[in-house]
Swiss-Prot record:
Pfam families: SBP_bac_5
GO terms under biological process: peptide transport
InterPro entries linked: SBP_5, SBP_5_dom
GO cellular component, one term: plasma membrane
Sites of N-palmitoyl cysteine lipidation: C31
One Gene Ontology term of the molecular function aspect: peptide transmembrane transporter activity
Protein source organism: Mycobacterium bovis (strain ATCC BAA-935 / AF2122/97)
Protein name: Uncharacterized lipoprotein Mb2616c
Signal sequence bounds: 1-30
Record keyword Lipoprotein present: yes
SUPFAM superfamilies given in the database record: Periplasmic binding protein-like II
Lipid-linked residues (S-diacylglycerol cysteine): C31
Length: 557
């Protein structure tokens, strides 16, 4: 479907970038305007699945699209912080050591198909991401791996979550938040089983079937009937999916069963980033653009739009495949020696990033992490790279999420710098998402942000994001396994002491720079472009992006 074109007339009024508490309708009334019925929203990449907790889903733009269709006990606010969502339910601390939490879902909470939201959904989220049950292609185990058990009576609204002794996860508020809770009854209906009973009793054959459906049943494909969309993709938020368009866009409409404050705009079409963004901005057929800075080239901002550039919580990096030409740390270090990290970061307008285990925050602890060990990899040294390879030629295939002008230029810069070292770098087009292409051996390197994402990719928590390098974690795309690093990552998850965290990071840095599972480049920058008639849109450094409060958005007519 071609994007619609609207005629805009200028109106006088105050431009507001708001938060979830801002009542856009009041502002519109004050400006003598009214809200348009539809908004067009462009996000970083493809919308391939409703389940943003799989490896592919977490790396996609799904979180930007579905933060207000799949709600949870919290959402990520404009600074990346977790904000309690009391419309959904409440969390109370029963005991601090070992950590025990009670999760109470609102009595009013109901999916758009009329089925209640229950503790069964928490059990499924935990089981899928705990690492205890085989078959689930979960992106991360962070936090969930430390849960000892969940007490849930099927069909009820309350769950008690007990953590393993001495594993009181500091950032436990990151668990069971928006987009993490999938509707377990969809799987139960397909398999005709009690999902909670099967998981809590570890029924092996049933768990295998549950995992298969959790991985794939929420794939987004055009052409599904209205009834199938309604039954397979129920919503627990202010918006629900109406349809998937042929070009991959997803149409969201107001959910009439939402029990909280109703969405201001009745319809939002979420578009995957394409090469036509400038044209769409020029003809005013898009209202909000939320993408990595530079990914759409220079992107000229017309007078009828306003633009904000800001740092994300994700790190743009080279993620090396566990097989192929870069399977050995020696060859990865050789490539790193000819990558002009200084020039690449300068082109992005930011400093070089060195941190792997404290990536989400931009503070003194992060700045110090790995700084000394990274020094030899700060500038291009083709002679050292050639010597590290013993003069043997090396061919490297790099892929990335397209279209992205900045990353294409980055690969060109690397190719030019590495050629004198006898390293041939090629820009490879793949027909599968980046993480899958890396798994399948179609590329040797994925150029992406945290977790292989096209967007920020970050949870907003360094302790959670550090699990990208924990063995067995789904988005540990390099397949890295080191028991010492696993122990450090686990220790970081339960430590709030800055001195202890600094000690742990200092212990990890020499190992990680020697074994080189990834090569951090720079903190991904974001561009938020919106019509001057948009209200209540605000930036967000995490993978949920600007969509975190889309139910408050309004476009003045």
């Amino acid at each position: 479907m071609a994007p619609r074109r609207r005629r805009h007339t200028r109106i006088a009024g105050l431009r507001v970038v708001g938060t979830a508490t801002l009542v856009a309708a009041t502002t519109l009334t004050a400006c003598s305007g009214s809200a348009a019925a539809q908004i067009d929203y462009v996000v970083d990449g493809a919308l391939v699945t409703y389940n943003t907790n799989t490896v592919i889903g977490a790396a996609s733009a799904g979180a930007q699209a579905f933060a207000r269709t799949l709600t949870g006990f919290g959402y990520h606010g404009p600074d990346g912080q977790v904000v309690a969502d009391r419309d959904f339910g409440t969390v109370s601390v029963v005991e601090g050591s070992p950590l025990i939490l009670d999760y109470q879902i609102s009595d009013d909470a109901v999916y758009s198909d009329g089925r209640p939201v229950t503790c069964d959904d928490l059990v499924l989220a935990w089981a899928a991401q705990s690492g205890r049950f085989p078959g689930f292609d979960a992106a991360t185990q962070a936090g969930y791996v430390d849960i000892a058990n969940i007490e849930c009576t099927a069909g009820q609204k309350k769950a008690r979550v007990s953590f393993i002794p001495d594993r009181s996860v500091v950032d436990h508020s990151q668990l069971f938040t928006a987009t993490s809770l999938m509707p377990s009854h969809v799987i139960a209906d397909q398999l005709h089983i009690d999902v909670t009973a099967a998981l809590l009793s570890n029924n092996v054959s049933a768990v295998e079937q549950i995992a298969r459906l959790w991985n794939s049943t929420w794939d987004l494909k055009p052409g599904r009937s209205h009834d199938e969309v309604r039954s397979r993709f129920p919503s627990s938020g202010p918006y629900k999916i109406e349809s998937v368009l042929d070009d991959g866009a997803v149409v969201l409409v107001a959910n009439d069963r939402w029990w909280g404050t109703k969405a201001i705009t009745k319809r939002i079409t979420v578009w995957p980033q394409g090469a036509d963004i400038q044209d769409r901005v020029n003809n005013r057929s898009v209202d909000v653009v939320d993408v990595a800075a530079g990914s759409s080239g220079s992107l000229v901002t017309p007078d009828s739009y306003q633009r904000t550039d800001y740092p994300s919580a994700g790190i743009e990096q080279l993620i090396f495949a566990p097989q192929g030409s870069l399977a050995q740390s020696r060859t990865r270090r050789a490539l790193a020696l000819c990558v002009p990290r200084d020039a690449i970061a300068r082109d992005a307008g930011v400093p070089i990033a060195n941190s792997r285990l404290s990536p989400a925050t931009d503070d003194a602890l992060t700045d110090a992490d790995g700084a000394a060990e990274a020094r030899q990899f700060g500038r291009v040294d083709p002679a050292a790279a050639r010597d590290a390879l013993g003069g043997t030629p090396l061919t490297v295939r790099i892929g990335y999420g397209r279209p992205n002008a900045r990353l294409a230029a980055t690969i060109g810069t690397i190719a030019d710098a590495c050629a004198p070292a006898g390293i041939t770098v090629s820009d490879v087009t793949v027909d599968t998402p980046g993480p899958q292409a890396l798994r399948d051996g179609k590329i040797d390197v994925l150029l992406a942000s945290t977790g292989g994402a096209t967007g920020s990719g970050s949870s907003g928590s360094s302790a959670m994001d550090a699990y990208d390098l924990h063995s067995g974690n789904g988005n540990n795309l390099s397949g890295y396994a080191n028991a010492q690093i696993d122990g450090i990552i686990s220790a970081l998850a339960v430590s709030a002491d800055p001195a202890e965290r600094a000690r742990l990071l200092a212990e990890a840095a020499p190992v990680l720079w020697d074994e080189m599972p990834t090569l951090p480049l720079y903190r991904q920058q974001r561009t938020l472009l919106m019509s001057t008639k948009m209200y209540a849109v605000s930036r967000n450094p995490t993978r949920w992006g600007a969509g975190w409060n889309m139910d408050r958005w309004a476009l003045a007519r």
